Amino acid sequence: MVKIAVCGAAGRMGQRIIVAAKEAGCTVSGALERPGHELVGQDAGLIAGCGALGVAISDDLNAVVDGCDVLIDFTTPKVSLKNLEACALKKKAIVIGSTGFTPEERALAAELAKDIPAVLAPNMSVGVNVCFKILKDVAKTLGDDFDVEIVELHHNKKKDAPSGTAVRMGEVVAEALGRDYNKVANYHREGICGERTKEEIGMQTVRGGDIVGEHTVYFIGMGERIEISHRAMTRDMFSRGSVRAAQWVVGKAPGLYDMQDVLGLR
């Protein structure tokens, strides 16, 4: 039985991961929160609403990592890298669902993962990862004859923009078309900005209300348009996906993996 520790255990996502881990038959061995959090010392299961687990929420990273097989982290890139470093020192696996990583931060994550198995994915949803595969195939088939635009929608509390999932969708399309995403991504259009270039991939962001997450990639040709969309109705798909990744990654060879590896989509 896999022993899972959860970082950000008192947050919305952390609570759903605890519930998902219990439902999957895993052992919730630890629950981590930032020092000074008001719920430190409380039973993680009671806070998550799944019944007492006998696991107190802790602010001691090293103790939590010591007691687990794998740590699941949905926080921020800065915190995730700190947790990844702690796991690397103790030879424990980690699953990271945080978004907003810069290329430099992602490179550092890959370096730290040389000694342990780690899953880093902007979206743990099975459906979204199937979309990644579909986007690759569609982009290769359509080639340069269709313009590509991406629109993503999230709740008004989301801190980063565009979403990590939207960026990854853009990267997948760019790679399939032989383009450098960082050079062709267009995040801003305003005023007299000139005609759209053939190579660019447009990115639009919407924030409002309680939208869990919606992504649509438009392939726009002359007289026709293809739309590939994914809509998240609940955060449970992310929590279930992260637990699935945690069960998969324990015992794997060191290295940085993503959900395409977990789901066997490569």
Curated annotation (Swiss-Prot):
Amino-acid biosynthesis listed as a keyword: yes
GO biological process per UniProt: diaminopimelate biosynthetic process; lysine biosynthetic process via diaminopimelate
Alphabetized CDD domains for the sequence: DHDPR_N
Binding site for (S)-2,3,4,5-tetrahydrodipicolinate: 155, 164-165
Known EC number: 1.17.1.8
Keywords carried by this UniProt record: Amino-acid biosynthesis, Cytoplasm, Diaminopimelate biosynthesis, Lysine biosynthesis, NAD, NADP, Oxidoreductase
Top-level taxon of the source organism: Bacteria
Record pathway: Amino-acid biosynthesis; L-lysine biosynthesis via DAP pathway; (S)-tetrahydrodipicolinate from L-aspartate: step 4/4
Residues that, per the record, bind NADP(+): 34
Active-site residues annotated for this sequence: 154, 158
Reactions the enzyme catalyzes: (S)-2,3,4,5-tetrahydrodipicolinate + NAD(+) + H2O = (2S,4S)-4-hydroxy-2,3,4,5-tetrahydrodipicolinate + NADH + H(+); (S)-2,3,4,5-tetrahydrodipicolinate + NADP(+) + H2O = (2S,4S)-4-hydroxy-2,3,4,5-tetrahydrodipicolinate + NADPH + H(+)
Molecular function (Gene Ontology), one example: oxidoreductase activity, acting on CH or CH2 groups, NAD or NADP as acceptor
Catalytic EC class: oxidoreductase
Stated family: Belongs to the DapB family.
PANTHER family (alphabetical): 4-HYDROXY-TETRAHYDRODIPICOLINATE REDUCTASE 1, CHLOROPLASTIC-RELATED, DIHYDRODIPICOLINATE REDUCTASE
Known role: Catalyzes the conversion of 4-hydroxy-tetrahydrodipicolinate (HTPA) to tetrahydrodipicolinate.
Name used for this protein in its record: 4-hydroxy-tetrahydrodipicolinate reductase
